[in-house]
Amino acid sequence: MARAKLKFRLHRAVIVLFCLTLLVALMQGASWFSQNHQRQRNPQLEELARTLARQVTLNIAPLMRSETPDENRINAVLRQLTQESRILDAGVYDEQGDLITRAGESVNVRDRLALDGKKAGSYFNQQIVEPIQGKNGPLGYLRLTLDTHTLATEAKQVDNTTNILRLMLLLSLAIGVVLTRTLLQGKRTRWQQSPFLLTASKPVPEEEEREEKE
């Protein structure tokens, strides 16, 4: 008798631990889902940035066709591009790679690209280089530095979404427990005939037999 009772308790403990493991996995899955959604946005933002860069090169190309590029008008376009945006700096180079003009943050290109090994700020920067096309080949190049750092408000939104998903999982678990206890209260079902339970030897009457007895 004691051995059967011990088996029953072990069986129940294994089921409870298995359910708790599944619950933890689901809650971690909710966190992974939110983070994966955030990661999927990065390629989309990069594609939008490249589309913007191509559009800017079309506007700059007429200013680069003369022997002396119009630095003032090119700089005006770059200033408008970098003003209050996620584009930290922008620069235009000739076909030989020499700088013509730039706008935005006054950070050295070597420091921006972390060529000297200082990567403190470069982790959140992304470089985009787009050629400025002419009739006979590239007239120059446009370089943009994007700020890919996640703002505090965006990170908070991701955390809120994760917490909402976890709360929904916990509510689903609570509803399942309440429904199970309500529907099966005082009622023996066929799962109770498991060889690990003490009631396994007692047959479960069919529903029709119960109705006839009543």
UniProtKB/Swiss-Prot annotation:
<dbReference type="InterPro" id="IPR019305">
    <property type="entry name" value="Uncharacterised_Smp"/>
</dbReference>
<keyword id="KW-1003">Cell membrane</keyword>
<feature type="transmembrane region" description="Helical">
    <location>
        <begin position="164"/>
        <end position="184"/>
    </location>
</feature>
<protein>
    <recommendedName>
        <fullName>Protein Smp</fullName>
    </recommendedName>
</protein>
<keyword id="KW-0732">Signal</keyword>
<comment type="similarity">
    <text>Belongs to the Smp family.</text>
</comment>
<dbReference type="Pfam" id="PF10144">
    <property type="entry name" value="SMP_2"/>
</dbReference>
<keyword id="KW-1133">Transmembrane helix</keyword>
<keyword id="KW-0812">Transmembrane</keyword>
<dbReference type="GO" id="GO:0005886">
    <property type="term" value="C:plasma membrane"/>
</dbReference>
<keyword id="KW-0472">Membrane</keyword>
<feature type="signal peptide">
    <location>
        <begin position="1"/>
        <end position="30"/>
    </location>
</feature>
